[in-house]
Amino acid sequence: MAEDNSWKTPSFRQSVVNKINEAIQQSGMTSSKNGLEMENHVFQKARNKDEYLGYVARLILHVREMNTKNKNQQNPAGGSQDGGNPNQQGGMPDPINALQTLATQGTRPQMMGGQMGPGGPMGNQMGGGNASNLLNTLNRPQMPMTGGMANMQGRVGTMGGPNQMGGMMPGQMPQGMPGMPNQMGGAMGPGGMSGGKIVGQMNPMGQMNPMQMGVSGMPQGAGQQQPQQPQGQQGGPGGPNQMNPMGGMGMQVNPGGHMNQNAINQQMNQVGMSSGGNQMGNLGGNSPMNPGNMGIAPNQVIRQQMPPGMNPNQQQLGMAGGQMNQMNQGVGGPGGNLGPVQQQQQPGQVGMAGMGPGGPGNLQQQNNPQQQSQGGPNAAPGQMNQVGGPGGNMQAMGNQGNFVPIGANPMVRKQDMMSGGQVYPGGVVRSVTPNQFLRQSPSPSVPSPAGPGSIGPQSHPGQMIPSPALIPSPSPQVSSNIPAPRNIGQSPGQSLNTPGQAAAPSPLNPQEEHLYKEKYRSLQKYIEPLKRMIAKMEHDDVDKMGKMKRLLDILCNPTCRIPLETLYKCEAALTSQLGTIREPPLNNPLVEAVSANLQSPLGNHTLQRTFRPCLEALFGPDIKNLPTPAKQPRLAIDEPSTSGSTGSQEIPHILQGEIARLDQKFKVSLDPCAIGDTKTIKLICWLDDKHLPCVPPVAVTIPEEYPFTSPSCSLIEQEYNATPFLIQVQKSFLARICKLPEMFSLSHLLDTWEMSVRQACSPNPSLVAPSATSVLLGM
């Protein structure tokens, strides 16, 4: 299959830059690099789309983690323990350096953190895969940080109410809504349905997939089953002890630790809620609530303390009534003894301890999902520790509840809260801090629908999942036909002021966003004057020029988001330097471009080439230059010298102009025999053409109303009847005169006379019959 290069497009990269900038603004982190530089660094470092999306996800999580770390440092009593991550030292390291450190952790197992939902732990989801699913969520509007963020699986917020859990960080739990004591994460309201999913993953290749979250990458024997079963509890109208797959894959676990394939198919897509029942195989036993030991109000998250003998995998919540089932499954191999290992795990986190090489058929499974202790210290008797496996040599982890009564504070940070520990072949427990578990994995850890040997729900951190919006996406590489459910939900956005975020005003506030865009648009008019000023003061004040260049960078780079107050300061500085500039007219750029191009020598040539055809099509060809007048006047006006004449005969200017524009072969003069008292003008015209024979002249009478009345012409009959040639000229001329229109000019008349002479000179003069068109065109 061809490699997907859509992540290299400028639009995709710009959307990633915007998300990085939003994360930086929300965390309030000050860094020497902006989002554009960080994204460019990641882009140059990544070799393919999965690496690129994985780096970006961890970069954004690192930025958010910095905010949480600062809060924890300011509150030591509720702070988390530092497990020695070099990136967790004092101060605020640069995200790029943290990203470079992450790249060296190529073989470190990946842990998965679940989050506490309102009124109880959320349904954890566990699955392996690559980061190809990040594309679906990164391109989705209103979900800038959803889908496939590494190591942040299983976060679900409630729909509606003030209890939305948009961007909760580990160690922080919001106060649940009253009346929802028994509901797990993803609850839709009192009696709603949870989004917990039961996921089984088969790895028939005999080796654990290093992309799986929370699984240490230790090779196993051939034929091992490694089912990962994050168990999401759900309290609904029927009873508090129900395990509801909610459209996921319900998997029954029997005491032998084997998977029941039939149960998988039967419980798939179930939304059943059997009253008081348990849909998780042999997981039974209720933890009765001791009302006398209830020391806190309903839905208050208490501070969890860990004595040496207590399993740190417990989450203790004081609920308002009902019964909650505690579950702890500790499963070892045939010869393995996990025993009382204190696996330190983030509350709400599903930990899969990757134990050493075991025998074939070893079912390695350790699911400690969201233990809930109802009531006080006596709430532990109802715990059920399921032990299974071929060898049967297993000891369940001890679950001890310890309640600390709290009065007014409904939300207290957990203390001594450690994220998922990893059991290595030597039995050593490796613990990491809650801040480190976000950056455990150097590779993306979002399950792909077609991931090798893995079926897992793809959880979008930060999403509110309306139950049970699950769309099965079958995995072609898995032998069993178990669809991998995929969560489709709306993101509450990055703008929720949850406890894990700074309570700063959101940059996505529509009103502030509108003000920012309007102000930024109004400052665009200063760009050109600022450029001219920088060009003028190039060798003057270096410090001032540096400030001007920074201002220009802010105005020219819309992706560089700055606070609104800074934008007002920029406007004040520009106004003081450049004065108030009126908004330029819309056509100003066009005028400037035309004037700049006209400066070049090719400007006129370009205009001629561009516009001449259009002008000719509209207005016709240009008027040609008039023929040069003859050196000698063609019309010699003889002043009559008769004694009776009172003055010379006036010739109209229009006639003079026409005679002056006649061809030089026509010679025109006044008729000396004409009577001078009348307004009618009589002319004698000769044809003087070296290519035509000499013919007698014609007499033309120009009426007084010329040119509104056509002139008349008469041939001297005595002369034109002399020879057959002249007779032919006379016949042709008379025939052509009849074809002329009602109104014609002196020029038309003389041209017709010339064509009659030419027709008479032709070898077959009688074959040519003139028409009105030919005569009018002078043919």
Curated annotation (Swiss-Prot):
<feature type="compositionally biased region" description="Polar residues">
    <location>
        <begin position="70"/>
        <end position="90"/>
    </location>
</feature>
<feature type="region of interest" description="Disordered">
    <location>
        <begin position="629"/>
        <end position="649"/>
    </location>
</feature>
<feature type="compositionally biased region" description="Polar residues">
    <location>
        <begin position="640"/>
        <end position="649"/>
    </location>
</feature>
<keyword id="KW-0804">Transcription</keyword>
<dbReference type="InterPro" id="IPR048385">
    <property type="entry name" value="Med15_central"/>
</dbReference>
<feature type="region of interest" description="Disordered">
    <location>
        <begin position="209"/>
        <end position="407"/>
    </location>
</feature>
<dbReference type="GO" id="GO:0003712">
    <property type="term" value="F:transcription coregulator activity"/>
</dbReference>
<feature type="compositionally biased region" description="Low complexity">
    <location>
        <begin position="209"/>
        <end position="232"/>
    </location>
</feature>
<protein>
    <recommendedName>
        <fullName>Mediator of RNA polymerase II transcription subunit 15</fullName>
    </recommendedName>
</protein>
<feature type="region of interest" description="Disordered">
    <location>
        <begin position="70"/>
        <end position="131"/>
    </location>
</feature>
<keyword id="KW-0010">Activator</keyword>
<comment type="function">
    <text>Component of the Mediator complex, a coactivator involved in the regulated transcription of nearly all RNA polymerase II-dependent genes. Mediator functions as a bridge to convey information from gene-specific regulatory proteins to the basal RNA polymerase II transcription machinery. Mediator is recruited to promoters by direct interactions with regulatory proteins and serves as a scaffold for the assembly of a functional preinitiation complex with RNA polymerase II and the general transcription factors.</text>
</comment>
<dbReference type="Pfam" id="PF21539">
    <property type="entry name" value="Med15_C"/>
</dbReference>
<feature type="compositionally biased region" description="Low complexity">
    <location>
        <begin position="339"/>
        <end position="350"/>
    </location>
</feature>
<feature type="compositionally biased region" description="Gly residues">
    <location>
        <begin position="114"/>
        <end position="130"/>
    </location>
</feature>
<feature type="compositionally biased region" description="Low complexity">
    <location>
        <begin position="285"/>
        <end position="295"/>
    </location>
</feature>
<feature type="compositionally biased region" description="Polar residues">
    <location>
        <begin position="477"/>
        <end position="500"/>
    </location>
</feature>
<feature type="compositionally biased region" description="Gly residues">
    <location>
        <begin position="274"/>
        <end position="284"/>
    </location>
</feature>
<keyword id="KW-0539">Nucleus</keyword>
<feature type="compositionally biased region" description="Low complexity">
    <location>
        <begin position="304"/>
        <end position="329"/>
    </location>
</feature>
<comment type="similarity">
    <text>Belongs to the Mediator complex subunit 15 family.</text>
</comment>
<dbReference type="Pfam" id="PF21538">
    <property type="entry name" value="Med15_M"/>
</dbReference>
<dbReference type="InterPro" id="IPR036529">
    <property type="entry name" value="KIX_dom_sf"/>
</dbReference>
<dbReference type="GO" id="GO:0006355">
    <property type="term" value="P:regulation of DNA-templated transcription"/>
</dbReference>
<feature type="compositionally biased region" description="Low complexity">
    <location>
        <begin position="393"/>
        <end position="402"/>
    </location>
</feature>
<keyword id="KW-0805">Transcription regulation</keyword>
<dbReference type="InterPro" id="IPR048386">
    <property type="entry name" value="Med15_C"/>
</dbReference>
<feature type="compositionally biased region" description="Low complexity">
    <location>
        <begin position="240"/>
        <end position="270"/>
    </location>
</feature>
<feature type="compositionally biased region" description="Gly residues">
    <location>
        <begin position="351"/>
        <end position="361"/>
    </location>
</feature>
<dbReference type="GO" id="GO:0005634">
    <property type="term" value="C:nucleus"/>
</dbReference>
<feature type="region of interest" description="Disordered">
    <location>
        <begin position="437"/>
        <end position="512"/>
    </location>
</feature>
<dbReference type="Pfam" id="PF09606">
    <property type="entry name" value="Med15_N"/>
</dbReference>
<dbReference type="InterPro" id="IPR019087">
    <property type="entry name" value="Med15_N"/>
</dbReference>
<comment type="subunit">
    <text>Component of the Mediator complex.</text>
</comment>
<feature type="compositionally biased region" description="Polar residues">
    <location>
        <begin position="98"/>
        <end position="108"/>
    </location>
</feature>
<feature type="compositionally biased region" description="Low complexity">
    <location>
        <begin position="451"/>
        <end position="468"/>
    </location>
</feature>
<feature type="compositionally biased region" description="Low complexity">
    <location>
        <begin position="362"/>
        <end position="383"/>
    </location>
</feature>
